[in-house]
UniProtKB/Swiss-Prot annotation:
Disulfide bonds: none annotated. It holds the Pfam family Ribosom_S12_S23. Gene3D superfamilies: Nucleic acid-binding proteins. Residues 111-125 have a biased composition (Basic residues). CDD domains: Ribosomal_S12 (cd03368). Keywords: Methylation, Ribonucleoprotein, Ribosomal protein, RNA-binding, rRNA-binding, tRNA-binding. One of its GO terms (cellular component) is small ribosomal subunit. It comes from Thioalkalivibrio sulfidiphilus (strain HL-EbGR7). This is Small ribosomal subunit protein uS12.
Amino acid sequence: MATINQLVRKPRKRKVEKSAVPALQACPQRRGVCTRVYTTTPKKPNSALRKVARVRLTNGYEVSSYIGGEGHNLQEHSVVLIRGGRVKDLPGVRYHTVRGSLDTQGVQNRKQARSKYGAKRPKKA
């Protein structure tokens, strides 16, 4: 425990909390342009071909962003909106693309959790 005299000379340091999503710069989402759209494999013990886009953001950052859902229409030069949220089994992927906004289409034939995938409500028969 520090004495009062020591604290007067040198106050306590505040702990700086490190952001999990630094490229967003305290914004909820950011717009960017796809520079590369590709698939990659997850860490052990999982196995799949995960869809990922390399995105150059409006603030100059370049990040990897996961494309959720079944099927997508993204290619190079597509304009996308990204949000925070990492993918646990893909190292270095700390952002998600927002489905159903800008050039990203929503998932087709999606019945449940539609708002997460930008899918419209299906028509009644």
